[in-house]
């Protein structure tokens, strides 16, 4: 793979987002929790001190840009590879160029975009070269490194969390592009009204790259008015981004209204309506992974034990999206939505857990009954811990009829009332049979 270009002198054909990449920390907008004056990271960057790191954050938050800025201060070459399009061959080629740089006395930053998409063996391939100083490793990921990256790689790189840019940050990015006479639209007869700037910032959900792409598209499409200026009106934004996209506000009320409509449609067993609201969310620029997470919650809250497979379907859709990307992944989430909408419904587990939580919070902290206590030591056994515990597998039907697992003060408590729908109907029959065994058992824990 070729080196990252750090030369902005010939930018005629570069997109606005590429032209406006910050060249130093002063131009970098956002991430003040990491880059504010006096923080350790900017001090290290400005001193040219390199260390391997993982940049974790949503799209458009400046992960690639920060890597480039670091390279500028360190006077280092940058090798960039993408885990989506690169394999072992590209890794070896990048490492070889880094080795040549080291032999020539130059430093190399290896920037790996979407590093979470590399498998364990591919991630391991970087370790010896990090260890011997051939490369300074910078990985960018939108996924939680704790789950997606090897512990060996994490132990050699510091993780920095980059947050979605605020609406004010995005407005500052847009203002910077409008005022910059070298890389942006400064000095040109292009006008960005405050209301349009705010609308773009609210539309892009903290994604600076998307904001600049939107601004560039508007500048290209705007017509010259009678005064010779191109005014980027909100109506043009609506045409470009879609009316529904432009309606998302900063607080997300519109977005959460759509999510609520989707959830209620699934709960109401209305697959067609659920698909409609899902499509509305997608076309409005909503995050499909947020919908995938909501599907997982629905599978537990509204389907529950009526169809335990619902949770597996929701997890599979989420996993599919992360593996294959938006085009195919959005269809997988749609499949999960239809499955959930058509599945038998039960909130029995949800309501049971709420009731148990209420008791745990509001009632006294009753002692654990002696027969249920752990007895790992001789002293505990002498104190009676675990005595008279009935091992269910030694009982008829693997059930200790008449046994009670509650404290005596709440021995008759019941939280879970299964419905008669789906698999939960069978669960209800099983629990009714067990209750009958308890009633008929001559052995009772509490009398």
From Swiss-Prot:
Q: Which InterPro entries match?
A: AAA+_ATPase, AAA_assoc_2, AAA_ATPase_RarA/MGS1/WRNIP1, ATPase_AAA_core, DNA_pol3_clamp-load_cplx_C, MgsA_C, P-loop_NTPase
Briefly explain the null phenotype. Answer: Mutation gives no obvious mutant phenotype, but, when combined with xer or dif mutants, leads to slower growth.
Please give the Pfam families that the UniProt record associates with this protein.
Answer: AAA (PF00004), AAA_assoc_2 (PF16193), MgsA_C (PF12002)
The record ties this protein, via SMART domains, to: AAA (SM00382)
Task: Say if the entry is tagged with keyword Nucleotide-binding.
Answer: yes
Q: What does this protein do?
A: DNA-dependent ATPase that plays important roles in cellular responses to stalled DNA replication processes.
Entry similarity comment: Belongs to the AAA ATPase family. RarA/MGS1/WRNIP1 subfamily.
**What is the protein's given name?**
Replication-associated recombination protein A
What is the originating organism of this protein?
Escherichia coli (strain K12)
The organism that produces this protein has a lineage beginning with: Bacteria, Pseudomonadati, Pseudomonadota, Gammaproteobacteria, Enterobacterales
